[in-house]
């Protein structure tokens, strides 16, 4: 009922909620615009979602002629799952021109993950006839590499190269279930955006999941995990690799040993030698041929270089003869790539290379990346990339405490979080009696639930803050002595009179007993 719905939505919008109206009208016209604002209600919705099959040029013209903002108020809907990779979905019909791919309205991508993720099962069934009624393939670990490629194909174009977007009819990737495509790639009409600014930045390339956890290159937890709070800033472009002889290098995320299968469910080998992470669950891996230097642009940035600024790259190579360089593009010379040597390669563990940037004081870094050169099959893993002005190391976390600890290892801890402007995240670890580090969690916040700390006896609980340049604070520490805790908590039970249900042994009473810790009987 318009008489009730419009004033209701007008009220929600006026209170600061961003709202959007959708109906099956595939045009932006008077009927659609009536859901944006009118004389009686004022602003009703913040924007409208125009149904699929729309025409960006006509919508832009009508909006401008009638006083509407074609970018703030008009979103052209693109139904991703309906056409999949087969067509452009009509997004190119809304380009400014054949040469200028700037959309004439905003774009609303509807359920893209349905087709690059959920659509994998449809493609496997279509190609092989295989299904899995117990658990979809898209949820099984051995198929995740396919979903990662399909996601990059959706956003970066069929060739997973942001410099080669656009309709690629006939371009196929049969290994991941894509037989042909007309999809243009989001990068064809949306330039990279970035939150990287100021004078400090860091990333460990964490995708927020892992087959295991690593601390300074060593495995610190053998459990598979997923935690978006631990995700680092990922590359702005996936991928942008160039060389004089063409692109011969490839890029991926290296999780260490991981299972992979093909569309038939048969095991396939990784295309690189798995290394794993320096910190977190994965590193960036560059592999392939690089007889001619290959430059990979990774991050769009707006970083100010100061007199004491340095860049840090933690990396390793498969071959000692491989050369790696930091590759920078400055805002005042966007057509020039400045390369700075990272020194000799390390083939035995990770190398921490520091690069002095003081010669570039006063300039702004617009792009950060790497350049790789070497003979034969080259592989370089990168575990950290950072820029620092030496001002971002945070203080020791304050107020660290254990709020709850159970005998089976569950734990709730809390602390006083610092402002996000100065602290990127917090690392929670346990250090056992032998000095081994056991990674528990990493995220920004002021509390954490740990499902199980699988350690016996005494151990040290350690909390460290990570700064905006990746520097790490001194730890806040708590000693946990498991032997000082009560154990074997039980309560007296009995069957009811019919022998069917277990209940308290004495009606109206709960009788508890436990094994006292070695240090004595609890006093409260």
Residue ranges with predicted function:
Residues 259-295:
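Short carbohydrate-recognition loop motifs
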Residues 333-364:
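Extracellular carbohydrate recognition and processing domains
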Residues 449-475, 524:
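Beta-strand-rich modules
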């Amino acid at each position: 009922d318009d008489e009730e719905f419009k004033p209701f939505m007008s009220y929600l919008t006026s209170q600061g909620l961003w709202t959007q109206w959708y109906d099956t009208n595939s045009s932006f016209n008077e009927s659609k615009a009536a859901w944006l604002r009118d004389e009686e209600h004022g602003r009703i919705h913040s924007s409208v979602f125009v149904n699929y099959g729309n025409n960006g040029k006509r919508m832009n013209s009508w909006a401008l002629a009638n006083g509407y903002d074609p970018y703030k108020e008009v979103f052209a809907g693109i139904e991703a799952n309906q056409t999949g990779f087969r067509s452009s979905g009509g997004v190119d019909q809304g380009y400014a021109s054949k040469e200028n791919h700037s959309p004439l309205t905003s774009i609303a991508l509807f359920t893209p993950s349905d087709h690059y993720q959920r659509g994998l099962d449809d493609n496997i069934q279509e190609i092989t006839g295989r299904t899995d009624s117990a658990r979809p393939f898209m949820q099984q670990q051995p198929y995740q590499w396919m979903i990662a490629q399909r996601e990059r194909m959706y956003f970066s174009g069929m060739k997973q190269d942001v410099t080669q977007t656009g309709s690629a009819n006939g371009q196929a990737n049969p290994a991941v279930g894509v037989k042909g495509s007309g999809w243009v790639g989001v990068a064809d009409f949306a330039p990279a955006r970035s939150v990287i600014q100021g004078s400090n930045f860091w990333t460990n390339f964490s995708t927020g999941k892992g087959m295991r956890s690593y601390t300074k290159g060593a495995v610190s937890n053998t459990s598979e995990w997923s935690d978006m709070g631990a995700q680092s800033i990922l590359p702005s472009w996936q991928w942008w690799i160039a060389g004089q002889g063409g692109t011969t290098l490839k890029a991926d995320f290296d999780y260490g040993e991981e299972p992979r299968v093909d569309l038939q469910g048969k095991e396939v080998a990784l295309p690189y030698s798995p290394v794993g992470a320096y910190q977190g669950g994965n590193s960036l891996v560059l592999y392939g041929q690089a007889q001619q230097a290959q430059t990979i642009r990774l991050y769009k940035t707006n970083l100010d270089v100061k007199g004491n600024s340095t860049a840090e790259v933690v990396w390793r190579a498969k071959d000692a003869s491989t050369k790696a360089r930091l590759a920078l593009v400055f805002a005042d010379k966007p057509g020039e790539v400045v390369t700075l040597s990272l020194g000799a390669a390390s083939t035995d563990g990770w190398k921490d290379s520091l690069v002095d940037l003081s010669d570039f004081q006063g300039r702004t870094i617009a792009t950060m990346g790497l350049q790789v050169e070497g003979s034969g099959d080259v592989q370089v893993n990168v575990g950290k990339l950072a820029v620092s002005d030496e001002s971002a190391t945070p203080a020791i976390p304050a107020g660290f405490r254990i709020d709850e600890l159970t005998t089976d290892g569950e734990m709730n801890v809390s602390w006083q979080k610092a402002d996000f402007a100065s602290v990127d995240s917090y690392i929670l670890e346990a250090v056992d009696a032998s000095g081994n580090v056991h990674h528990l969690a990493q995220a920004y916040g002021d509390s954490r639930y740990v499902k199980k700390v699988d350690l016996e006896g005494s151990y040290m609980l350690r909390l460290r803050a990570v700064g905006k340049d990746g520097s790490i604070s001194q730890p806040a520490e708590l000693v946990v002595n498991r032997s000082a805790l009560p154990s074997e908590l039980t309560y007296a039970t009995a069957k009811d009179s019919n022998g069917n249900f277990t209940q308290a042994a004495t009606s109206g009473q709960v009788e508890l007993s436990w094994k006292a810790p070695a240090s004595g009987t609890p006093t409260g």
